[in-house]
């Protein structure tokens, strides 16, 4: 099971200048995230929410090498055992870092994409989302790194640092994918505290983080890719009525340009 905590992040990621095409511009996003005040906020959350922040085995997902190196350095400055691992890390060093995390001699490994898939460290008991992840597939792969079964491991703790996001960013699909009934209205689920989760799981949102997410869903800019991604986040393809009700959107969003419902499914 997982305990998913959404932490309020005061970083403003809503400006269109941070966005390129279908995702955030990596370098501009890193400029915003490599911030000492934000690092302090992250450390404060570790102290507040983790049972033992000095002995956990955490994967920390970062936006690029600069961000991963920055976060590892900041965590070390606060007394945590932390390292960074990216595609530039030599193979032998990668293996050693993975071994250290597995054995508990390393507690925080700040990574970029490389741990999305193909690397199995069942002992990981904590995941930190230190960046917004646009791809639902990558988000689920990252979450899955911590959901492996391991002796003595009772649950996964997830800290997701939620900032004010660009209107093109999709929070809805992410949280819908975590519920047992993704066809249900996701805004209602958020407001009611997620009553449709797997046994033993929870999603808890700090007040400001919850409002950021609800505001984002309400003001979302829909294009064809966004709509297709949302449809694909359902367990079964929804009807037109279900889709509109669950997203709180006007039918006109589906008929912009040459779009139509049958072509989007």
Mark where each language-model region is.
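SF2 helicase motor core recognition
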Residues: 109-127, 143-148
């Amino acid at each position: 099971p997982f305990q998913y905590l959404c932490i309020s992040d005061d970083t403003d990621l809503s400006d269109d200048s941070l966005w390129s095409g279908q995702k955030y511009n990596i370098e501009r996003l890193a400029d915003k995230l490599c911030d000492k005040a934000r690092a302090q906020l992250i450390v404060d959350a570790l102290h507040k929410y983790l049972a033992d922040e000095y002995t956990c085995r955490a994967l920390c997902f970062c936006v690029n090498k600069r961000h991963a190196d920055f976060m590892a350095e900041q965590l070390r400055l606060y007394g945590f055992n932390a390292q960074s691992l990216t595609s530039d890390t030599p193979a032998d060093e990668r293996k050693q870092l993975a071994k250290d995390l597995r054995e508990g001699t390393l507690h925080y490994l700040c990574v970029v994409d490389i741990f999305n898939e193909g690397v199995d460290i069942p002992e990981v008991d904590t995941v930190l989302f230190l960046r917004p992840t646009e791809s639902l597939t990558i988000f689920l792969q990252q979450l899955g790194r911590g959901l492996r079964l391991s002796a003595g491991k009772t649950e996964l703790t997830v800290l997701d640092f939620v900032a004010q996001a660009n209107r093109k960013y999709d929070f809805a699909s992410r949280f819908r994918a975590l519920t047992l009934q993704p066809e249900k209205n996701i805004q209602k689920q958020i407001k009611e505290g997620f009553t449709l989760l797997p046994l033993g799981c929870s999603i808890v949102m700090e007040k400001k983080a919850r409002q950021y997410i609800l505001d984002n869903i309400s003001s979302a800019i829909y294009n064809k890719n966004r709509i297709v991604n949302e449809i694909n986040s359902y367990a079964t393809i929804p009807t037109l009525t279900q889709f509109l009700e669950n997203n709180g959107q006007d039918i006109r969003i589906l008929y912009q340009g040459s779009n139509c419902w049958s072509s989007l499914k």
